[in-house]
């Protein structure tokens, strides 16, 4: 029984099967054949066509092969959103290798762990992170490092100004060590090699993405070439009443080392034969907004913290930026407040939908409909060819009936799930059982097939035998007019096992006391759910896509108690 199928937007396909036996390389090259000068990427005023992307990635693939990179080898990509990331990734794929996408902002400890986790022997790195990679190289299997400068694909004048004014200050002026080779030198060398001849199958491994770090050191989730094509088709199909082939400009500010962008935005852009506009730093809110204005971006995948930051920025409050080109937004990573949704939709005359995915799902799982009913607090319904059931937490072979009283673990069946964690069969077996992905998220499904997340299985707070869902408390706190951001977790308590604690960032110019917050919560929550402790902060620790790291707050609290 799949009640969600009856609530899809009109005209959307209920299934996309059978999926074509293709790779994203094939998809890209179909556009090269049909419209070679269609723009594939825009970066700071530079446009790169599908044909040019094909040529550059061929050149890089040839260079990798000549360096000894073999089919199945892992090549680490340690870069933000710059054209070299996309060129290198397609080049890695054409060489038959696996792209291991690593957050360049990792600490040296985290970076060494990621490199060792995937076993990469080659790393492509932006110059300002070169020293970091070199510092940990001896702790890893990395044999060769390929540096690339952020300025390489800037327009001529901007490149000159960057060289004169910013290159040294930003840490991008480097001397490379013996044995390492510049990215552009490899492009020149490989450009004389023609079309790579390595045979790449849809079932070959294409991608390693690292889990988000909300539960400790990251694990390496593996996706195939077919995974990416399926994900791209699912996303494009869900939005096909708005997105049109060849026409749309995907604002890509979310980092390409993250599942949202790499297994979601990028495949959907190529499947739709659209354009990706790259923004290297999603935290640079003025740059994000000015890029939307200049490039007339139409599709804006984002996260709640970015929507909030834009709404309160002077460029918006003083009407100094035009965001009217946006016709569709998708929000992920954390819950989107209804107030934020309504204000941003009013600002842009666009529609915001919410999506739900995990690194392990390799993107598309659930999404709210574009035209159908919006249900506050819901992550939407399964997209085409995805099935979701709510499993009993005591016996996960049993599925729970519909309704808010039947909370269980969200379990997914889908054709695009990860193959597993790289060389971690035990961890894989915990997540993947008989072809189903056990998410660790608790929630319920209503009779229309809409799914509601209650909380993470591991984050439930136990107060005197009662269960408290942090998200429920956070949703109440977020309604307080003085609260900008908040997070809730359980801290040890000798009397009640755990106590509820809230960490709060106040809106600029607003004030509140712990007593104010507690009184507000008592009006809406049962007594044991009201935060016993309230801490005001200037900011909350977040992941690279703006997800609040509850674990870090709990860790800080534990350190205070010792």
Segments and roles (model prediction):
Residues 389-411, 447-448, 510-514, 549:
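Conserved beta-loop-beta connector loops within the AMP-binding
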Residues 147, 294-302, 315-374, 387:
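Gly/Ser/Thr-rich phosphate-binding loop
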